[in-house]
Curated annotation (Swiss-Prot):
Keywords: Activator, DNA-binding, Nucleus, Phosphoprotein, Repressor, Transcription, Transcription regulation. Residues 1-20, 130-147 have a biased composition (Acidic residues). Efficient DNA binding requires dimerization with another bHLH protein. Binds DNA as a heterodimer with MYC or MAD. This is Protein max. Residues 39-90 form the bHLH domain. The gene is Max.
Amino acid sequence: MSMSDDDRDIDIESDEDGDSDTGLGSSRHTNTANFTQAEKRAHHNALERRRRDHIKESFTNLREAVPTLKGEKASRAQILKKTTECIQTMRRKISENQKDIEEIKRQNNIIAKQIQALESSNGDQFSEFLSDEEVGSEEADDEDLDQDFSRRNKKMKTFHA
């Protein structure tokens, strides 16, 4: 029994659904047992070309994701080296930011306790401080409030330095 041309089609569909470099993630595999040696070689070459194209595209995507390499020509070794450096820098920044967040949370807790202590010890005096005259005044100078906030903000920033 002879095979038709349709039966001999070689599956070289892209491996977009699978995330495998070897092409094993594909759900369709071609049985090459009935192919000639030349057809098997052509099939193997097509698979290898697809694998190389996938690797090349992955390196291009990686190069474009690294700020110091974006738009630059770079060897694969340079791409890997700069990517590693970028990841290490990002990890360091994340760690520093997490420490800053913890410090700010700690400062917020201290300030909240101070506010609570002031409110409980000076309940009557606090109410007098916020009299209708001061709170209700439409002509309160917003710049003074902004400057006061700015000074407090600067103090907080230098507090842990």
